[in-house]
Amino acid sequence: MSTRGIRAQLLQTDDEWETRNAVLSRHLADLVDEYSASGATDGIEIGCQVGALTEQMGRLTRVPTWTGIDPALTEKIVSDGGCTLHPGRASRLDFPDETFDVALFANVFEHVPPDERDVSLREIYRVLKPGGVVIGQLPNPYFPIESHSRLPFMGWLPTKWQHRYWKLAPVSWGHDFYVVTIKDLKRTAQRAGFDVAHVRNFNYPPEVIPNGVRWAARLLERPMRYMPWSWQFVFVRPA
């Protein structure tokens, strides 16, 4: 098989990617409804891209109003689903204190530069109401197939070697993540004042995995209970 063929096997089809997004949305929405206050009205997604997950939170959760911020946005826009999306970074949230009941922080922390991690969690804490919650997900950098590059053992390498190895990645984007674990995130959240309410291992079902390597996911099913693809978490700003 050619190198191009091998790379193609590591990428999800449109249907597999759509299934992945649906699974992620459903699991995060369940956490929002379980841990947010019964009268919660306002949510914000940190790192919303173009608002696909933001919109899903409005559809799937009891929280009716959602907004989002993303550094790639150049101006304020309204998504097709009616969510207002703003340019911005987690380290500088342009909202008043105690604005939101829920902050969604899914697959974002690993992209935050080290010198912005503490201030980012402090900013999220600031814009949450007392009793507000952070719901999110963090990919495991030590999972055998690293999620950003789709390459084996990328997260185990020193950063300099990661950039060299990235040239073999089948993806169209560049290297843009840091190796951080749930322990790093929990410590950062606790320094900001959050209580850790819940952490769980999370793995996507086989139908999300590219069909060409789905057999490997089935073989790894048992080890993945201990070495998960990612962690999902809930942090609470004390009331």
Model-found features: residue ranges?
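Conserved N-terminal segment of class I S-adenosyl-L-methionine
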Residues: M1-P96, V102-A106, L121, W229
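Short catalytic micro-motifs in class I SAM-dependent methyltransferases
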Residues: N107-H111
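Short aromatic-enriched loop/helix-cap "lid" or pocket-rim segments at secondary-structure transitions
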Residues: S79-G81, I145-R150, V208-G212
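Short N-terminal helix/helix-N-cap motif within the alpha/beta-hydrolase-1
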Residues: G51, P113-R117, E146
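A short glycine-rich, Lys/Arg-flanked "PGG" loop and its adjoining helix->strand segment in the class I
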Residues: D118-V133
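Acceptor-substrate binding/catalytic loop of class I
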Residues: A169-K183
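A C-terminal cap/extension of S-adenosyl-L-methionine-dependent methyltransferases
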Residues: I182-Q190, F194-A239
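Conserved class I S-adenosyl-L-methionine
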Residues: V134-K160
